């Protein structure tokens, strides 16, 4: 697969460094965030979070024209969803905490509006078992004109995979490039596409 344009949904502690690393390899990266302040800050070549070396990579990537940010999703070859998945409030002390996937669902809706045949969608957010399949279901509901791996397997129009972030604040720029990655695709083709994408900088 050719990944000329990569979109990262969610420009926080994982999404922004990920965007910057792809852009540093001279890939066109479109970062998407709901915060206009975040978007404006990044487009001015600055950062809104504290992370060593990130400001230098972002500034160069923006100045070189490889990184831009927006509040609305735009067409791309690959989409990485890196939004928060906080725990929902527990009802009582015996309840098991459950993750809130509403941000993922909102990101899916945003991506679905510009999705096209051949695209790859990766969930990077820390998520529970079954979340990647759920994401594929949500995408299919939004785009019945496209086929997805949970129904069409290897022949699907869209590739879907999971690659959870595995970095520690303070060392993100180094770890995002050096740490081993665990990639799980809904099919072999999905996994292969995700591996090819991350090989750009890992």
Residue ranges of predicted features:
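Glycine-rich Rossmann-fold phosphate-binding loop(s) that bind the pyrophosphate
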Residues: 11-12
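Gly/Ala-rich phosphate-binding loop of Rossmann-like dinucleotide-binding domains
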Residues: 19, 23-24
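Conserved N-terminal Rossmann-fold NAD(P) cofactor-binding segment
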Residues: 2-5, 28, 34-78, 82-98, ...
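Glycine-rich, N-terminal phosphate-binding loop of Rossmann-like dinucleotide-binding domains
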Residues: 82-83, 125, 186
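Internal alpha-helical scaffold of NAD(P)-dependent oxidoreductase catalytic cores
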Residues: 138-163, 167-202
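N-terminal Rossmann-fold NAD(P) dinucleotide-binding loop
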Residues: 15-16
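Rossmann-like NAD(P)(H) cofactor-binding subdomain of soluble oxidoreductases
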Residues: 87-166
